[in-house]
């Protein structure tokens, strides 16, 4: 594939890591941040000390705070902002020429809609989109360690182009057309990672964590099937792959947030200690609202949402789950 110009909108750890990957394989990559001071620091240090310290930028990775200029000068546009900022970004940018891809995992907090629904409302239902998801920590991608991802799209031609853009010796990309399933996996797994962190923080051990992962997978699959997703998506990289990674490894900020809650650290202090956006905290209420709308039981997510809103404490949430009526698996 000919080398392209990429606009990466969002200079957190994940957006930066993927920008580094794309630049390393030869694409000119514009890394946008809304914060001019952040951009100046990245340009000065040729790295992102705030979110991905110690990993140098390739020469063709260029920080910028000019959103419109980045989009207009790019062949491909990728969004990597947190889910609560996604709507603001797509409403500010001009319509990209090729399509729009995103790394963001979550749902819109205002409308409870999937991010693909927001894009369809803004740019049209036939506008090419792609969602990139799967088990992937930023530091490992930035260091060129082996990673496998799922790329879901509504347009096979655009999907092929995005596949060629990303695919390399260190990143293997698998294709899907299940946009609903891939997006739900990315949102729900963060809530379940908080649950696993809480369990470990309480000292409940490996058995409890395995149960939370397994029953959590059942919850997210039920929700997905009720919304038209395919079951095999939840058994793939975007589903069980990302779920296991996020629930078991302390690189996950959602899991670390849960660990702190399990150790009775207050929510504001736990967020402060994490120092970055905890998507599961932002998306718990939205996922529960979507589940209620679709008449789907999601007891783990419901207990985490109740805990985050001060209705129950960590020990209570676990007790409520363990005391539920017996049922068939």
Curated annotation (Swiss-Prot):
It is found in: Cytoplasm. It comes from the Bacteria. Keywords: Cytoplasm, Lipid biosynthesis, Lipid metabolism, NAD, NADP, Nucleotide-binding, Oxidoreductase, Phospholipid biosynthesis, Phospholipid metabolism. Pathway: Membrane lipid metabolism; glycerophospholipid metabolism. NADPH binds at residues 13-14, 34, 105, 138, 253, 277, 279. SUPFAM superfamilies: 6-phosphogluconate dehydrogenase C-terminal domain-like, NAD(P)-binding Rossmann-fold domains. Catalyzes the reduction of the glycolytic intermediate dihydroxyacetone phosphate (DHAP) to sn-glycerol 3-phosphate (G3P), the key precursor for phospholipid synthesis. PANTHER family: GLYCEROL-3-PHOSPHATE DEHYDROGENASE, GLYCEROL-3-PHOSPHATE DEHYDROGENASE [NAD(+)] 2, CHLOROPLASTIC. This is Glycerol-3-phosphate dehydrogenase [NAD(P)+]. It comes from Legionella pneumophila subsp. pneumophila (strain Philadelphia 1 / ATCC 33152 / DSM 7513). The gene is gpsA.
